[in-house]
Amino acid sequence: MEMPRRFNTYCPHCHSHFEHEVEKVRSGRSSGTKWDARRTRRGKAVIGNAGRFSKVPGGDKPTKKTDLKYRCSECGKAHLREGWRAGRLTFQE
């Protein structure tokens, strides 16, 4: 799917329509231990299944939702919107 890099849309900070630049959200730094690792560690000292899942959590979906950030050209602030499913997303210059 192709999408324009810049287009006019509403800015919730300026309360008006201005040109926005679209960028993909980069992943942040990962935290120490995730919730499932903490849960497993809690279960190690008990009788039973030691905090494991009875069924393995599901795999990946065939397409991912878009994760985009819209940056206002007027105030410079960025906001997020709900993503949609797209196989491949490219930006038009």
From Swiss-Prot:
Q: InterPro entries attached here?
A: Ribosomal_eL44, Ribosomal_LSU_eL42, Ribosomal_zn-bd
Any one GO CC term of the record: ribosome
| Cofactor (UniProt) | Zn(2+)
Q: Tell me the Pfam families matching this sequence.
A: Ribosomal_L44
Q: Could you tell me what the cofactor note in this record states?
A: Binds 1 zinc ion per subunit.
State a single Gene Ontology molecular function. Answer: zinc ion binding
Q: Start and end residues of each C4-type zinc finger?
A: 11-75
Record GO biological process: translation
List positions binding Zn(2+): 11, 14, 72, 75
Q: Which domain of life, per UniProt? A: Archaea
Alphabetical UniProt keywords? Metal-binding, Ribonucleoprotein, Ribosomal protein, RNA-binding, rRNA-binding, Zinc, Zinc-finger
Function in brief: Binds to the 23S rRNA.
Q: How does it assemble?
A: Part of the 50S ribosomal subunit.
Record's family?
A: Belongs to the eukaryotic ribosomal protein eL42 family.
UniProt name for this protein: Large ribosomal subunit protein eL42
The source organism is Natronomonas pharaonis (strain ATCC 35678 / DSM 2160 / CIP 103997 / JCM 8858 / NBRC 14720 / NCIMB 2260 / Gabara)
For this protein's source organism, the top of the classification is: Archaea, Methanobacteriati, Methanobacteriota, Stenosarchaea group, Halobacteria
